[in-house]
Curated annotation (Swiss-Prot):
GO molecular function, one term: 8-oxo-7,8-dihydroguanine DNA N-glycosylase activity
Catalysis: reaction(s): Hydrolysis of DNA containing ring-opened 7-methylguanine residues, releasing 2,6-diamino-4-hydroxy-5-(N-methyl)formamidopyrimidine; 2'-deoxyribonucleotide-(2'-deoxyribose 5'-phosphate)-2'-deoxyribonucleotide-DNA = a 3'-end 2'-deoxyribonucleotide-(2,3-dehydro-2,3-deoxyribose 5'-phosphate)-DNA + a 5'-end 5'-phospho-2'-deoxyribonucleoside-DNA + H(+)
Cofactor(s) named in the record: Zn(2+)
Recorded name of the encoding gene: mutM
Protein's UniProt name: Formamidopyrimidine-DNA glycosylase
Organism in which the protein naturally occurs: Photobacterium profundum (strain SS9)
Family listed: Belongs to the FPG family.
Lineage: Bacteria, Pseudomonadati, Pseudomonadota, Gammaproteobacteria, Vibrionales
Entries under SMART domains matching the protein: Fapy_DNA_glyco, H2TH
Function summary: Involved in base excision repair of DNA damaged by oxidation or by mutagenic agents. Acts as a DNA glycosylase that recognizes and removes damaged bases. Has a preference for oxidized purines, such as 7,8-dihydro-8-oxoguanine (8-oxoG). Has AP (apurinic/apyrimidinic) lyase activity and introduces nicks in the DNA strand. Cleaves the DNA backbone by beta-delta elimination to generate a single-strand break at the site of the removed base with both 3'- and 5'-phosphates.
Swiss-Prot/TrEMBL GO biological process terms: base-excision repair
Length: 269
């Protein structure tokens, strides 16, 4: 599933091709995604794309009359292609641009979304989200306050989008390992010093993943159709039973909140 770095890489890739371009046509080949694509999205036709932003794992394509909201779901990707290239099997949505290019949305599992929001109003999918992890709003003081008294396992806690957005399973595993925190430890029992380190590691891991083009485990490709390379930098995710990169102790694996968690029982307390 594309997580925050992969979505940010997609944003960076499509922005130079889209900003300032007019959407001459929107082609919806299959409206049945995670939620039905609303008829209102047709309003994007004839509009200039003013900017492309990201909120959590949603991409926002802004125009003067509203904004398209794109979520990549489990297997979605966005490509910039010449409009003359015919669509393939799982190409569900095209935005045809005045430049002669097309923004093409491919989603084999159809668990992504295309929605429509009105100017200056948060769509309901955006209204309850926590701060961005790479922003100045996500601080040790903020996380310490949110964690106070919480018995929830820190891994589940940090993956809650109401606490902070975009720290998905891959990056939660990696950040907890880097900070030396056991994933089942109660969020409210972690010291201020460890919380501060954890916040720093989350920011560092996510920033490095973006620099590496995201993580491609199966489906993700960027706007040029290329995979991300952060998978080569993973320290623990997907490596249960292999030696810890710090102490050589075999890495443990368990399910926490129905998600695979890999950690070192020696290095993470």
């Amino acid at each position: 599933m594309p997580e925050l770095p992969e979505v940010e890489v997609s944003r960076m890739g499509i922005t130079p091709h889209m900003v300032g371009q007019t959407v001459t046509k929107i082609i919806v080949r299959n409206p049945k995604l995670r939620w039905p694509i609303p008829e209102e999205i047709q309003q994007i036709e004839g509009q200039v794309i003013r900017k492309v932003t990201r909120r959590a794992k949603y991409l926002l394509l802004h125009t003067d009359v509203g904004y398209a909201i794109v979520h990549l779901g489990m297997s979605g990707s966005l490509r910039i292609l010449p409009a003359s290239i015919p669509p393939e099997k799982h190409d569900h949505v095209d935005l045809v641009l005045s430049s002669g290019e097309v923004l093409r949305y491919n989603d084999p599992r159809r668990f992504g979304a295309w929605l429509w929001g009105l100017p200056d109003l948060d769509h309901k999918v955006l209204s309850q989200l926590g701060p961005e992890p790479l922003s100045n709003d996500f601080t040790a003081e903020y996380l310490q306050e949110r964690a106070k008294g919480k018995r929830t396992a820190i891994k589940q806690f940090i993956m809650d989008n109401k606490v902070v957005v975009g720290v998905g399973n891959i990056y939660a595993n990696e950040s907890l390992f880097s900070a030396g925190i056991h994933p089942k430890r109660a969020a409210g029992e972690i010291s201020p010093e460890k919380i501060a380190l954890f916040v720093d590691e989350i920011k560092s891991v996510l920033a490095f993943a973006i620099e590496q083009g995201g993580t491609t485990l199966k489906d993700f490709k960027n706007a040029d159709g290329k995979p991300g390379y952060f998978a080569q930098e993973l320290q623990v995710y997907g490596k249960g039973g292999k030696p810890c990169p710090r102490c050589d102790n075999p890495l443990s694996e368990m399910k926490i909140g129905q998600r695979a968690s890999v950690f070192c029982s020696e290095c993470q307390k």
